[in-house]
Amino acid sequence: MESRVLLRATETVTGVPQLRRPIRAINRQFSTASSSFTAFAKPIGSIGEGGNLISGRQLRPLLLLDSLPEKREILKPVRAASAEGGDSAGETKVGFLGKYPWLVTGILLLMWYFLNVIFNILNKKIYNYFPYPYFVSVIHLFVGVVYCLVSWSVGLPKRAPVNSDILKVLIPVAVCHAIGHVTSNVSFAAVAVSFTHTIKALEPFFNASASQFLLGQPIPITLWLSLAPVVLGVAMASLTELSFNWLGFISAMISNISFTYRSIFSKKAMTDMDSTNVYAYISIIALFVCLPPAIIVEGPQLLKHGFNDAIAKVGMTKFISDLFWVGMFYHLYNQLATNTLERVAPLTHAVGNVLKRVFVIGFSIVIFGNKISTQTGIGTGIAIAGVALYSVIKAKIEEEKRQGKTA
């Protein structure tokens, strides 16, 4: 029909007499063509949105049908059904958790706190009858690696491919992670859990120092001032800590330095891989890093009397069960911390991390009945308050930078 209309338009320009055809014949022919189109044409969308198209051509007869008053009532049910069908096809059904994302975030935070507290308590209980932190650190990573391999085998999540370039950037991160993990456990085994976490509250101070003096990134004076209470509080707590010894103190400080370098290398090792796969690969590499020191430092003692003493105290079943579950709790709480970070703003995660440390210190004191002096308690409180202040200020600065880039 289009070719006929174009032909008539051409003839109209070249020969005006063509217009003398009877009006009734033209109307009859047009109405016949119109009815033939409407017989097979089905409405696809609204006209205003470019709908009612077949092979890219808009069906004009429907416009004429729509313009007739007696036809409008006929078209209303059809349009309503079409709109309902379009809505149902265009929108996916949202589940209960999808409707309430804040509920998912809250559950993740609670699980993160719960698993972290359980890990620290169970970890310290193991050290009370099995004081071999190098070996226990290997068990933490080994159980996590097995968990990752099983998850990959069932496709939850799907394993991301890795190549030599990715390994080059992940290996430094994994080495720092391994050193920080082992030294943290050495400190946990040597002193009270609450004291180790108080020392580890200095980690932001090391991060700021590394950023300022190693990376050349200027740190605002407000951040430095917020770190003063942290240093003061840790110093007060250390001077009167009843479980203080230099091995626990120095190990916790080395852990802070190691995790600081891990943060530096992590910034340089940004990849397109998701966080779950990244943490899995880091755990695998860290496991191989931790194995040699564990064999060299604690291997002979373990074979001589370490395993036998532990089994004699708690039994084989409990010993193996404790090692398995402490490894599971370690891996899961770290994974949940990463997943929570992806769902919330940096400020929320920073405050959550501070509150987590408060929970761990508080529960460890209650569970183990650790006696602390008044000065140690005040110093710990000042240090935690300083970390909270630092975290809030830093998160706000990062948010302002992010908004400035997007503006």
From Swiss-Prot:
Lumenal side stretches: 123-134, 234-277, 397-407
Function summary: Mediates the export of fixed carbons from the chloroplasts into the cytosol in the form of triose phosphates.
Molecular function as annotated in GO: organophosphate ester transmembrane transporter activity; phosphoglycerate transmembrane transporter activity
GO cellular component: chloroplast membrane
Membrane topology field: Multi-pass membrane protein
The family this protein is said to belong to: Belongs to the TPT transporter family. TPT (TC 2.A.7.9) subfamily.
Transit peptide: 1-79
Residues forming coiled coils: none
Swiss-Prot/TrEMBL keywords: Chloroplast, Membrane, Plastid, Transit peptide, Transmembrane, Transmembrane helix, Transport
Chain segments annotated as transmembrane: 102-122, 135-155, 213-233, 278-297, 376-396
Subunit structure: Homodimer.
SUPFAM superfamilies: Multidrug resistance efflux transporter EmrE
Chloroplast intermembrane side: 80-101, 156-212, 298-375
Predominant localisation class: plastid
Keyword Nucleotide-binding: no
Subcellular localization, as worded in the UniProt entry: Plastid, Chloroplast membrane
The protein's name in its UniProt record: Triose phosphate/phosphate translocator, chloroplastic
Keyword set includes Protease: no
